[in-house]
Amino acid sequence: MKQHTPPVNLRVQRSALAATGLALLSLLLACGKPAGVGGAAGEASSSTAASNAQVTQSLPLDQREDFEDAQRGFIAKPTGKLLAADGSVLNDFDAYGFLAGPAPATANPSLWRHAQLNANVGLYKVMDGVYQLRGFDIANLTLIEGKSGWIVVDALTSRESAAAAMAFADQHLGKKPVSALIFTHAHVDHFGGALGVISQQEVAQRKVPVVAPAGFMEEATSENVMVGTGMGRRSIYQFGRDLPRSALGNLDNGLGKDVVYGAMGVLAPNWLIYQASQPMQLDGVDFIFHNVPNAECPAELTFSIPSKKLYNGAENLSHTMHNLLPIRGAKVRDALRWANYMDQALEQTKDTEVFIASHHWPIWGNARGQELIAKHRDVYKYTHDQTVRLINAGYTPREIAEMVKLPASLSDYFGARGYYGDLRHNVKAVYQFYMGFYDGNPANLNPLPPTESAKRYLDLVGGADKAVAAAQVAYDKGDYRWAAELLNHAVLGDPSSQSAKTLLAQTYEQMGYASEAATWRNAYLTGAQELRHGPPAQGVPKAAAIDLLFQTPTERFLEAMAASLDGPAAADKNLKINLVLTDQKESYVLWLENAVLHFKRGTAADAHATLLLTKPLFVKMIAGTAGVKDTLLSDELQVKGSKIDLVRFFGLIDKAAGVFPVVTR
C-alpha cells in the first residue's frame, strides 16, 4: 500500500500530550495479582490411580500401528531450544523427553499414549516429493516439491518457528526457493509464521502464489480482536501455557505440543478458493482444492494431488475428536456441516493412498484413510443427532452430556477419541448451537451471580469450614466433581478460606490427572496452580501479533474499542473525536451517544478534538508496544482542538490486562 507523508507535526504542550499518550497507552496497565495459598503439585490419589488403571484395562494401548505411522519416514530431529530475539525460550525440543516411559498414575494412559505419538518431532518423508516438519509448533508445516521449489502448506504460528522449520529442511533436503504458499485455514497456528517462510517483498517480486480459502483475510485478521483479551486469558488454561512439562503438568495439547508464541504475521493471499472443487496448478503440480467453510473454521480448504494420490484434510481431519466449541471460547461450530464435509471427503478420496492433515501424522493405505474419515463423520453426526434427539425429549445440556455415549465402534477407535475436544462439552456445544444459553428451567433464567450464590450456600451450611469438611469426605471417596462444586462455593463465598483453596487445588489436580482430553487436564491443573500461586503476571501479549494487527481493518479496532467503553462512566458524556490515519487516507468520527461509542467514516466540524496519527502508531499503542516517550516525540502524532476532551474520551476505554482471576474472585 502506498505510503503518504504525514503533515508537519503541530507542536502542543508537553503536559497535555503526555496525558493523551498515557490515556491511549493504558493497555499497558496491569491489574493486581491476588495471592495464592502456595504449595506444590501432588501425587495421584488411590481413586485416581484406580481410574487410570481401569483405562489401561479397557483400551488396547499396546496397538503399535499409530506409532509406526508417526515414525515412518523419519529423517532428522531438532534438539535444544528455539529462542526469541530477546533470549526467551519459545520452544524446547527436548521438554517432553519424560514421555518415553510408561504412563504414571498422574496421567490418563490413553492421553499419555497420544502424547507419546505427538512427541515424534522432526523432519519426515511422507512420500516422494512430500515432507512434513512436525513438532516445531503445534501444527505441521508440509513441503511439496514443485518444478522450481517448495510448495509450502501452512506456516505455523510464528515467524521464529516457521523460519526454524524451513532452515531445518534446507539443512537436510537442500535449499530451494519457495514457489507457492498455501494456507489451509484462518487459525493463526497455520499462517502466523508466514513471514518466516517468505517475505512480502519476495512474494511481490517473484509473483509467488499465495493460496487460501475465500474469506481468509477477514477471518485471519479479526478472529480474536473483539474478545481477544478474554479468549487469550482462557487459552492459558486450555493450552497449559504456564504448567511444567512433566508427568505432573503439561503432557500435550491434543493437536500437538506447544504453541510457539513468537512474532505473528500474515501474507495476503493472491489466489482464493471459492468452489467445492477447484483445480489449480502450482509450480507444475496439479491440485484440486475444496472450499469447506464454517465447520472447523469459518474459512478453510482441503486439497488433493491426484498424481500423488495424496489428500490433505487440513484441520477437518485429525487423530482426535475435535472441538465443536473450544474451552478457550469461540463461536459454536456446525457439527452437521462438519459431518457432511467428511462425507464429501469420502467421495473425494476414493483413489487416495496417502492422507495427511494440518496436525498429527499421516496414514497410508486407502482403506485406513477412509476409515479415519468415516469415523470422524460419524462421531460428529452421532454427537449432533443424539443431542438433538434428547433436546426434543426435554433434557437439559448438563443432563444430555451425561447421557450421550458413543457406540463402541467409535469410542474404541483411537483416531476419534477426545484428546482435544471432548464428547461432554461437544454435546453442550450442539445444544448451544440450536438452543442458546437457557435450559428452559425458570430457576436458571435469572440466577444469582456465582459469588452471591456462594455466600448464601455458605450461610446455609454454616460457613466455609463446614463446606470444606463435607468436601473432604467427598474427596476421600474419590467424588471429585462434588468436592469441586462444594469447594468452588467455599472459595468464592469466603476468599479468606485458605483450606478451601488448598483442597480445591488438590481436587482439580486429581480431576486433571484422570482426564483423557489434554485440554481438560491443562485447565484443571492450571486452576490448581493459580489457586496456589495466583494468576500469571503476564497474559497473552498483543505485541507478538503486531505484524498481523497492521493488516487488520481499522473498523475492527474501532468495534473493539466501542466494546471496551465503560458504559456507566460514559452515561452523561457527550464527546466527539475525529480520528485521522494520515498514512492511510482514512478518517473516522467517533462519538458518544446514550453511553454507546459510535463511529463512521469522515470527520465532523464540531468535534471536540482531532487526533492525527499513522496507522502503525495507532496499532502499536493498542498493542502496547509504543511507549509514552515514543508517542510524545513522534512526528506521527498530532492533536488539534481540546486535548483535555481527548484525554477524557480515551479515559473511558477500559484497560483490560488479560490476567484477571479465573478460579478466584
Stretches found by the model and what they are:
Residues 27-30:
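C-terminal motif of bacterial Sec signal peptides marking the signal peptidase cleavage site
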Residues 129, 144, 154, 169, ...:
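Divalent metal-coordination and catalytic microenvironments
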Residues 60, 64, 69-72, 161, ...:
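Active-site HxH/HxHxD metal-binding segment of metal-dependent hydrolases
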Residues 149-150, 157-159, 261, 265-270, ...:
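Metallo-beta-lactamase
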Residues 36-112, 228-259, 347-354, 361-555:
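Accessory terminal helices/loops
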Residues 116-176, 300-305, 309-315:
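Conserved beta-strand hairpin/beta-sheet module of binuclear metal-dependent hydrolase folds
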